[in-house]
């Protein structure tokens, strides 16, 4: 077989494959740029959402939790927690109660620390998590349970 496979053929395969995959890359980039405006909910971003993201970052929530698949996997995914915990009517009261109850002190379980957040900070965090739950992630991450 080595007699029929020449350097010229190897060069053609290399350059042809490079051009092919570069064109695939360009096509995927174009597709992403075209669909991105449909997937984002940037127009719904409020001051409360921005403040909630600051609370998220300042308390290093991503050090334990993941958000839309990014972050640590020590604690549950929070990208869809707004939907999992009942939506508009029940989410804020749930989050307030959950944050006040920490740490739960259940033996043998991971413990979330008490951050001593103000009512406003918890409300802002709730708005941030609500906003992230409305991003069209094309069903990513696949774990719906958190």
Curated annotation (Swiss-Prot):
Pfam family, one: Cytochrom_C
Keyword Secreted: no
One MF term in the entry's GO annotations: heme binding
Subcellular location: Cell membrane
Gene3D superfamilies tied to this protein: Cytochrome c-like domain (1.10.760.10)
SUPFAM superfamilies reported in the protein's UniProt record: Cytochrome c
Binding site for heme c: 61, 64-65
Matches recorded under InterPro entries: Cyt_c-like_dom, Cyt_c-like_dom_sf, Cytochrome_c550/c551-like
Record membrane topology: Single-pass membrane protein
Induction context: By nitric oxide.
Function: Component of the anaerobic respiratory chain that transforms nitrate to dinitrogen (denitrification).
Full protein name: Nitric oxide reductase subunit C
Species in which this protein is naturally found: Stutzerimonas stutzeri
Record gene name: norC
């Amino acid at each position: 077989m080595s007699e029929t496979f020449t350097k010229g053929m190897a060069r053609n395969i290399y350059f042809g494959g490079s051009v092919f995959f570069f064109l695939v890359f360009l096509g995927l980039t174009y597709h992403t740029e075209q669909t991105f405006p449909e997937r984002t909910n940037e127009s719904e971003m409020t001051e409360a959402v921005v403040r909630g993201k600051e609370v998220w970052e300042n308390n290093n929530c991503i050090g334990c939790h993941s958000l839309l698949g990014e972050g640590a996997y020590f604690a549950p995914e929070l990208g869809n927690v707004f939907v999992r915990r009942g939506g508009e009517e029940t989410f804020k009261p749930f989050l307030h109660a959950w944050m006040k109850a920490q740490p739960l002190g259940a033996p043998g379980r991971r413990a979330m620390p008490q951050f001593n957040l103000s009512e406003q900070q918890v409300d802002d965090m709730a708005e941030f998590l609500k906003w992230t739950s409305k991003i069209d992630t094309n069903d990513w991450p696949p774990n719906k349970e958190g």
